[in-house]
Amino acid sequence: MVDLNGISPKNKGYYVALGLEGSANKLGVGVIKQFVDGSPTEIVSNIRDTYITPPGEGFLPRDTARHHKNWCVRLVKRALAEAGVTPGQLDAICFTKGPGMGAPLHSVVIVARTVSLLWDVPLVPVNHCIGHIEMGREITGAQNPVVLYVSGGNTQVIAYSNQKYRIFGETLDIAIGNCLDRFARTLKIPNDPSPGYNIEQMALKCKNKERLVELPYTVKGMDLSLSGILAYIDSLAKDLFRKNYSNKLLFDKKTHEQLVTVEDLCYALQETLFSMLVEITERAMAHVNSAHVLIVGGVGCNLRLQEMMEQMCMDRANGHVYATDERFCIDNGVMIAQAGLLQYRMGDYVKDFKETVVTQKFRTDEVLVSWRD
């Protein structure tokens, strides 16, 4: 059993951490308490502000960084006030080291360094992916599941072994969230609250579910490729908008009647992408002899993905799917605080400010998970 109490807490019986997340367009600040006796983590503040662009547009690093720079200090003040915590009570300040977009990461780490010096509180650099996993484990109570990590920047199937989160399969090109977001831009649907959520809602309106539009399905062993399916469905959407009657898949050859709607395309995209995810996840479960799946990351909020994963798990003895809602699936500060405080309690925190340099590339399996057996 790992001893997590090697460093004494400032507060009697519990540790307090401030978490700062800003690797993409979500800026999250959270405050948590972890207890010496091993009681469940208490989330005392979880605030988020999202940089939202107009329909049909993505978010540029420089604009996202400007948003984070303008809002980060205000969110820190709000989070501490909401939590009823003073800077003197903080055991650690945790920030996202990577992976993510360079400029937004820099905006947030500058705030983390500044308040660390002002308040004389240790800094803890956190891997974004590890934050998702540890928050998911804490909220759901999942002990040792296969993890499906699906977000705008990452698509990985992960399992724990020998103090590392090992990657068993991943995307070979773009992430699933990026695929959904880019298709949403093609359709020019709103980015509020998120493109993926709006695609999910459009898919629910599909009236031709028995006539699934056939899309490329590219699974290569434990890995998958998503750029081909995006290019193909983009071309279908553009033909639909241009009313390209020569496309026999979309229009009747004789009457030019429209056979496929935008909602049909959204439904087909979700069904195909999620089927690929279920396949590689089940393969990983068989490999490590696990019956449990934990879904984390922004795309993990999708109820259809959760439903398809549950259907797969029903065929396995004692199969179970663990998932959280948008408070914890979508990027947030408390997940960084959760993973960071575990690191801090094992003595893993910044001794030299050179260790606070952020990075756009930081793989899940690079981190020593010292707080687990």
Swiss-Prot record:
Residues annotated to bind substrate: 149-153, 181, 196, 200, 302
EC number: 2.3.1.234
Catalytic activity: L-threonylcarbamoyladenylate + adenosine(37) in tRNA = N(6)-L-threonylcarbamoyladenosine(37) in tRNA + AMP + H(+)
Top enzyme category: transferase
Superkingdom classification of source: Eukaryota
Cofactor comment: Binds 1 divalent metal cation per subunit.
GO cellular component: chromatin; cytoplasm; EKC/KEOPS complex; nucleus
PANTHER family linked: TRNA N6-ADENOSINE THREONYLCARBAMOYLTRANSFERASE
HAMAP family the UniProt entry points to: Kae1
Family matches, as NCBIfam families: gcp_kae1
Protein name: tRNA N6-adenosine threonylcarbamoyltransferase
